[in-house]
């Protein structure tokens, strides 16, 4: 009895530790590099143990994706082959919604049948969860109202992010060759950049997930501006370049002004990263007020110009044309008149 309890306890601990230690890794499947999530976990829903195996398997659908037979096909395939990795669903990754699968199947199966193929059994829709009865993801949910724990990937000490060894070509891209331009934190810069998010954050980690992508993990402390909800937790910032500009190091406390793209927070060369000072919070708020005033002024001018153009029709440009002189009347003399006035001499 005691032995059975001990075995059960050890098994429970093994499973619990295994779940907590389940690794998340950067998405490396080329077809899925531009999904709203950039971190996945293996094995996936099709039981591929590595992304390399998943890449070989998903390649068979590249032509189908390229012909764009369905607007949700790529999303569905990536949700199956590179499932989103979140802390709450490490043991059982989130599946795509049944409706997404059905849309992709109904859109693309007629084309597949033209080439004597049918929708594969491995991608059957019957076993997938329904949106209102379980947890699942769809393109609409991510764009509009997806919960924070799904939209923003937590990278906490409980989750290990595996660093992939750099390719030979990537190793040649030495950081020393990158020359980052310093962007000064001024009002003029703020007005011209018109960034979509401004945050106070602490740099937690910087990792390269490919030759042309760097992921900077930051711990968000304050949010001064955002175009979409930003959680006050650890979030990834994506640099889609071989150069990490602006150049930052772990443990730095900074103010970041940059842009969002496809629901991903970016960290680009023309963005501003400044060592944190308390004065910067007041400045950023004042700058945002000036930016809004500038927008209101421009809108008011456009409205005024529109009203003026409607009330006063446009006048013709240039000088009015001069009146044409009356054409002189020609004194046409008939032959008989000519004979009378100019009689021939006899």
From Swiss-Prot:
Glycans are attached at residues 38, 68, 116, 194, 240. Residues 178-307 form the NTR domain. GO terms for biological process: bone morphogenesis; canonical Wnt signaling pathway; cell differentiation; negative regulation of canonical Wnt signaling pathway; negative regulation of cell population proliferation; negative regulation of non-canonical Wnt signaling pathway; non-canonical Wnt signaling pathway; regulation of BMP signaling pathway. Pfam families: Fz, NTR. GO terms for molecular function: Wnt-protein binding. Residues 1-18 form the signal peptide. One of its GO terms (cellular component) is cytoplasm. Residues 330-346 have a biased composition (Basic residues). Keywords: Developmental protein, Differentiation, Disulfide bond, Glycoprotein, Secreted, Signal, Wnt signaling pathway. Belongs to the secreted frizzled-related protein (sFRP) family. Soluble frizzled-related proteins (sFRPS) function as modulators of Wnt signaling through direct interaction with Wnts. They have a role in regulating cell growth and differentiation in specific cell types. SFRP4 plays a role in bone morphogenesis. May also act as a regulator of adult uterine morphology and function. May also increase apoptosis during ovulation possibly through modulation of FZ1/FZ4/WNT4 signaling. Has phosphaturic effects by specifically inhibiting sodium-dependent phosphate uptake. This is Secreted frizzled-related protein 4. It comes from Macaca mulatta (Rhesus macaque). The lineage of its organism: Eukaryota, Metazoa, Chordata, Craniata, Vertebrata.
């Amino acid at each position: 009895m005691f032995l059975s309890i001990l075995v059960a306890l050890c098994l429970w601990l093994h499973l619990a530790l295994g779940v907590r230690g389940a690794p998340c890794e950067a998405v490396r499947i080329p077809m899925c590099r531009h999904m709203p999530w950039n971190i996945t976990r293996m094995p996936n829903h099709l039981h591929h143990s590595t992304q390399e195996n998943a890449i070989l398997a998903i390649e068979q659908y590249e032509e189908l994706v390229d012909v764009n037979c369905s607007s949700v096909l790529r999303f569905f395939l990536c949700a199956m082959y590179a499932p989103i990795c979140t802390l709450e669903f490490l043991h059982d990754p989130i599946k795509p919604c049944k409706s997404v699968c059905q849309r992709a199947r109904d859109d693309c199966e007629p084309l597949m049948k033209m080439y004597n193929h049918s929708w594969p059994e491995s991608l059957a829709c019957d076993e997938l969860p329904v949106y209102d009865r379980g947890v699942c993801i769809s393109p609409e949910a991510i764009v509009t109202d997806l919960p924070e724990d799904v939209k923003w990937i937590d990278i906490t000490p409980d989750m290990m992010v595996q660093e992939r060894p750099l390719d030979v070509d990537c190793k040649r891209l030495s950081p020393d060759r990158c020359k980052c331009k310093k962007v000064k934190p001024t009002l003029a810069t703020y007005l011209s950049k018109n960034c979509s998010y401004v945050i106070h954050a602490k740099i937690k980690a910087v990792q390269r997930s490919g030759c042309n992508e760097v992921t900077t993990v930051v711990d968000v402390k304050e949010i001064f501006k955002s175009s979409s909800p930003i959680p006050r937790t650890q979030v990834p910032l994506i640099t889609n370049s071989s150069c990490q500009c602006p150049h930052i190091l772990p443990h730095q406390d900074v103010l970041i002004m940059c842009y969002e793209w496809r629901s991903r927070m970016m960290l680009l060369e023309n963005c501003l990263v400044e060592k944190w000072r308390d004065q910067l919070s007041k400045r950023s708020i004042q700058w945002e007020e000036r930016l809004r005033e500038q927008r209101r002024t421009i809108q008011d001018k456009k409205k005024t110009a529109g009203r003026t153009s409607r009330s006063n029709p446009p006048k013709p440009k240039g000088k009015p044309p001069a009146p044409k002189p009356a054409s002189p009347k020609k004194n046409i003399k008939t032959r008989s008149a000519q004979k009378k006035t100019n009689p021939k001499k006899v």
